[in-house]
Amino acid sequence: MSSSRKQARLDAKTNIESLSVQPYPNSNKVYIEGSRPDIRVPMREISLADSLVGGTKESPIFEPNEPIQVYDTSGVYTDPSYDIDVYKGLPKLRQEWIEERNDTELLDGVSSVYSQERLADETLDELRYGNLPTIRRAKQGQCVTQLHYARQGIITPEMEYIAIRENMGRQKFADEQLNHQHPGHSFGANLPKEITPEFVRREVAEGRAIIPSNINHPEAEPMIIGRNFLIKVNANIGNSSVSSSIEEEVEKLVWSTRWGGDTVMDLSTGRNIHETREWILRNSPVPIGTVPMYQALEKVNGVAENLNWEVMRDTLIEQAEQGVDYFTIHAGLLLRYVPMTAKRVTGIVSRGGSIIAKWCLAHHQESFLYTHFREICEICAKYDVALSLGDGLRPGSVADANDEAQFAELRTLGELTKVAWEYDVQVIIEGPGHVPMHMIKENMDEQLKHCHEAPFYTLGPLTTDIAPGYDHITSGIGAAMIGWYGCAMLCYVTPKEHLGLPNKDDVKTGLITYKLAAHAGDLAKGHPGAQIRDNALSKARFEFRWEDQFNLSLDPITAREYHDETLPQESGKVAHFCSMCGPKFCSMKISQEVREYAKDSEQVALDQAIEIKMIDDPLEGMRQKSEEFKASGSELYHPVVEAE
């Protein structure tokens, strides 16, 4: 191992061991209690400064601003009252809910042959997570999926938790300015003014939403993926044969949840996949997804032709018993679709898709994922693992977008969705890829038509191919658009896409870009309450409350750093201008002066005031401002007077 790799592992290990609670600036962790004491839904509450609304310098009049509550994925990592210990894992939030349903049983040991072999290997003791939980499985004849409960008319604690979480405490806002929202265009989505537990149950029962919640991952805070809810963002992490360690992956997990990752996919392809995944699951407050095919391939030494159902089945059970919440399964790639990719510019770009295509051609038969799909569903139903039906034939270039191969597979995914629903297994559908802007809506329309409104989950899509190093931007454009059209979850893309494995900083950049895209989509489709945070930040901006601007942003740290590059002094935090326009040309300062001018001139309406202000005798205006400046003591800067 190179010295730089050793140092990276050491740094990550140090960060994990010394992990301290680091909440966002001026934010508090708050919990909203549901109908029972153990339903405590976390929110991040951002405290705001008061607004100066009148008075004099000696006797200013202030008006308080309500704190803003925002969706929080960071788990207990930002709760000052919790003592973090990654070696013990997170609290088992859902364990009591699972137990009281009385439809599961505890196993004496692991069922997977591979898991048994790993446990027996003493050389792995130092790598292994030391506090392994007892495995849980559905009792004989029972189904333990949230879809099953929803279809039975049962509102689970998870559903109530989600309803509270999706509303983000917006019911408490009385401020008309904060509540103002433009009507959106939802393209047929059903967006109620308030999310109720019954609405959550109904959406899950109809297959329009999923709650990824493996019974062996009780640490995960319940969340929902669906067209009629807030758009979610997935972050990918994972080691490879040439890069990254267990320590670094756990660090990236915690980092991902801090910056808004609603789910995390572990796409590890290197050594010690099993052990890495255990560490991630025990320390993850969000659902974890995987592509089981990657690990199955490792078990046959990377030779795709040697894959078989027995290896795959054992891998599915292994991961389900560890607590993986959703599997990406490329079961819709059929043998007859492979020739359709021959004329493509970039062929088959999905790793899972290329593995299946190679296997199909080598054996000249349909893949074992397709022929054993019902058995896959039976396994998932025992643990409540959701299926993310993979798009192995997604386009890898804009030239290949929306071709016959892509849409043929999509129609098969729709057929498989109905099969999974027969077993009460939750389903989402994966989508592209690389699609130019004018062709994106067709993807959403086709998915809704052929996949029966099961939630759509897309990688971008990237809207152009010319920007390696900036593909978080090329894809963020497409992500915002398809989110508006109805996509339920967006898989983030980092600046390293097509270039290398992302590091910690890349993960943050990708997540911030995609949280922005998701929020833009929520605004466009008119999700209730989506505009509250925008309104609060805009009000802070107009009132030159700089700290509130930073703290309300998606990335307060970067916002503050950019401001301080040119105005680092504390006086810059109270100045009524920034370095972009300077004190003389700040549009918002001028606008405030226009308002004051109109207020002082009782006979003049606001629109007239603007005209007078701009074209009236400029010399008289300058004389007035000169007198005001002298009267104020000829002070260039006037700090904001703090409320007592």
UniProtKB/Swiss-Prot annotation:
Binds 1 [4Fe-4S] cluster per subunit. The cluster is coordinated with 3 cysteines and an exchangeable S-adenosyl-L-methionine. The gene is thiC. It comes from Aliivibrio fischeri (strain ATCC 700601 / ES114) (Vibrio fischeri). One of its GO terms (biological process) is thiamine biosynthetic process. Keywords: 4Fe-4S, Iron, Iron-sulfur, Lyase, Metal-binding, S-adenosyl-L-methionine, Thiamine biosynthesis, Zinc. GO terms for molecular function: 4 iron, 4 sulfur cluster binding; carbon-carbon lyase activity; zinc ion binding. It catalyses: 5-amino-1-(5-phospho-beta-D-ribosyl)imidazole + S-adenosyl-L-methionine = 4-amino-2-methyl-5-(phosphooxymethyl)pyrimidine + CO + 5'-deoxyadenosine + formate + L-methionine + 3 H(+). Homodimer. It comes from the Bacteria. Zn(2+) binds at H434, H498. Its EC number is 4.1.99.17. It is an enzyme of class 4 (lyase). Catalyzes the synthesis of the hydroxymethylpyrimidine phosphate (HMP-P) moiety of thiamine from aminoimidazole ribotide (AIR) in a radical S-adenosyl-L-methionine (SAM)-dependent reaction. Belongs to the ThiC family. This is Phosphomethylpyrimidine synthase. Pathway: Cofactor biosynthesis; thiamine diphosphate biosynthesis. Substrate binds at N236, M265, Y294, H330, S350, R351, G352, D391, G392, L393, R394, E430, Y457. [4Fe-4S] cluster binds at C578, C581, C586.
